[in-house]
Amino acid sequence: MRTKINIEYRRLKGLFFILYSLFISMTLASCADMLEPESDLVEFEEDHTLNHATDSVYSVMGIINKMQIIADRVVLLGEVRGDLVQPTSAANSDLKHLSAFDFDGDNRYNQISDYYAVINNCNYFLAHIDTAMERRGRNLFMREYAAVKSYRAWTYLQLALNYGEVPLILNPLMTEREAREAMNQPRADIKTICETFINDLTPYVGVNLPEYGNVGNSNSEYLFIPMRALLGDLCLWAGRYQEAARWYHDFLTDKYDPVMMSRQKITWANSTQFNAIYNSYTPLKSTSEILCYIPMESRVFDGTISQLPNLFNSTTENNYFYELTSSASMAKISADQIYCFENDIPGATTKDTLYAPRTGLIRSELTGDLRYYSNYDLTSYGSKSDYSEYNSYRQQIDKIGAERIIIYRSTMVYLRYAEALNRAGYPQSAFAILKYGICDDILKQRVDPVELSLAGDLVSFDPELFRFDGSYFGIHSIGSGDSHANQYYTLPQPTEALPTRQDTVAYQIPLVEDMIITEMALEGAFEGYRFNDLMRVALRRNDPAYLADPVSRRKGEADPEATGLRQKLMDPKNWYLPLH
């Protein structure tokens, strides 16, 4: 899909006042100029009020235009700092420094002003849109107002995850003085950011998203962030797990627009010959899976194009020299899974359970979970000549595309719903999402009555919408076969009975959480989630090693740089980019 956002708002005087450019010229010792406006780049009317339908449409498109600039960093900052991706020898120095958490110098991926450009656009829109205007009994601009609030909250969450503590600015900055004063205020941490925007968004959760039809070649419904899912994320980061589970549940089970669990999977074609697979797994191309994305341009002339294909894949533009590749850690996580078959036995009422071999396969990526094989391919075209300017290896990561950067998709929301349920005290229900799928019939079979009673309608699914049938399966089955029958993939149990039920729940919660985080790696690899997933649990447990250990070992146990990197990452202050 090719997306073109260069709509004619570029020609309309007065509508680009919200495309307000900001830049950074700060050092570690001084940050007074971080938000200084570059007023020469825009033409605006300071007292202009947004009171025409075209104002709101073009202004929202302008905000998306600014979001395009930070879109690649959603993936890069989440993966290059994580353990599933590592830079190659061909990588640019900025990627190598990012991977090593070496932030002493300038880095093209550390441009905080780009985030504040989005935020200032949002702040201006929210301050000037006429939310009282009605026509024929319908509020004209409330949908855009709510959508822009979501853009702002999401952007601030990205800031907090990447920088740790940042200035929290909720009003538009129109002068250099205002920008300098904003920089002198106390900085807000992740929890403060989340609490602020939980309160900011909640009153508007019932407002429908704007309906613009097609914008270029994009269906505009995918351009807007689902507010309930975003509130779930904010509550999850804030440690408000019951509320997070509520928001995720209500989003997924909306009777007017329910979000079903994935029906896509990749499987071995049969259980006797392991030389062919059946693959319907295309999560970033399926309209049933995609919830929200940032569209990218197809030509530099039109605006911002994604550089991810040239960083992750072999292309003619990079002479096939990819700069980022799958790590040894990613391969190990995938290979550690056990692929299960459940076969019918002729004339019998029971089924036969088999497991895929772990050696002798035609490709090493086929060991364990098959999602890795589905997404990653590395092919050799012979040895490289000393005189050739082209790489003899070709890498293709199918999840990486130029058309859009996906920021919400259904399976990842289900996994965060599982994470919230588990931390809220419902590990059986959370585990059901991984192993069986989730609907009322499954929950009644797989979750004990005590937990079902305690969880109440947090795990209630309308049987008319979420109906159990033979195609229902848990998320782990997307790449690991018939997980419902897998005897090696089970709910953790203590070796001896514990004194109380609550003791057992407390024992299970961190272990189920580990399984969820592993599943997030298998399902969400190369999409930008990994570092933040590790960080969220490390902060929750007050255990920096939860992040430091896997990230430092991304290249394998024998990596000579692992010890120094682990020592650096044991201090959470080193996880974040500096504000310069």
What are these regions (language model features)?
Residues 31-78, 546, 553-580:
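Membrane-proximal, proline-rich intrinsically disordered regions
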Residues 57, 92-163, 184-195, 202-214, ...:
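Conserved, well-structured interaction surfaces
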Residues 2-29:
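Sec-dependent bacterial lipoprotein signal peptides
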Residues 31, 291, 295, 302-307, ...:
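Long, intrinsically disordered, low-complexity segments
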Residues 339-410, 432, 451-452:
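Flexible, polar/acidic helix-loop-strand segments at domain edges
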Residues 32-34, 165-169, 194, 198-210, ...:
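Aromatic-residue-lined binding/catalytic grooves and analogous aromatic/hydrophobic interfacial grooves
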Residues 190-193, 207-215, 259-280, 345-363, ...:
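Surface-exposed intrinsically disordered loops and tails
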